[in-house]
Swiss-Prot record:
InterPro entries: bHLH_dom, bHLH_ZIP_TF, HLH_DNA-bd_sf
Family: Belongs to the bHLH protein family.
Protein name: Transcription factor BHLH089
SUPFAM superfamilies: HLH, helix-loop-helix DNA-binding domain (SSF47459)
UniProt biased composition (Polar residues): 95-105
Keywords: DNA-binding, Nucleus, Transcription, Transcription regulation
Basic motif, as annotated region: 142-155
GO terms, molecular function: DNA binding; DNA-binding transcription factor activity; protein dimerization activity
Record-linked Gene3D superfamilies: Helix-loop-helix DNA-binding domain (4.10.280.10)
Its job: Transcription factor that may regulate jasmonate-regulated genes.
Organism: Oryza sativa subsp. japonica (Rice)
Keyword Transcription regulation in record: yes
GO biological process: regulation of DNA-templated transcription
Amino acid sequence: MDPAPTLAAELWRTPYLGGGGGGGGGGRGLEAAASGVTEQSNGSRGGGGGGGAGRRRQREAPALEDDSSRIVSTSGGGGGGQDLTDSEAKRFKASKSSGDNSSLRTEAETDSRNASKSGDQNPPPPEPPKQDYIHVRARRGQATDSHSLAERARREKISERMKILQDLVPGCNKVIGKASVLDEIINYIQALQRQVEFLSMKLEAVNAHVNNGIEAFPPKDFGAQVYNTAPGLTFDPQTPREYAQGSTPSEWLHMQIGGTYERVT
């Protein structure tokens, strides 16, 4: 068995057992051990111990040096080692954060590029067809369809006629609401109709009485009679010839009442 690897292993264990109190002494021991290993490996290679073992020792020597340098930096008890570890940790964190930020930026850029590509590929939606009729903002109770213009004109005419009727009917301006206005107008028209009927009946009665009075007196005696209807009033006689020329009884009554009565003083 070759004593070089065993000696290297024993020297390797010494820094871990030494702990943090050794400080710089542990580092020097490791450097001496590494140099001894290299010397033994060179001697064995020069002594002809075997080509394969020498090559393996040469390969293991730089690895041991790297590990020893790492152990010196981490296991050293002084403040210099801790400062190095802290600075390395900060550098590592800074590099990691910068890497994360760069990755986020690249992801955002790729997303924006994909979105722009998708927007370019997808065409905009077609515009809705325009309506043939003119859209008018509807008031309360008004339609906005294609027949809205004619409907609005008809309602405006109705409202104008209602205003005219309100002006004709007395006291209708005080009423509020179309239904109540129509009721007032209907009642007024019915009252006028009843008055007209009453006046027509009275006129028929007067005409019948006048006709009966004319038939009671013959035409030859009609002109010679003088009627005293009231004290102090005289009645001018009318000749039958003037009555027979085409005057109706109603006209004759109007003439007698209107201009043939004179007050005697």
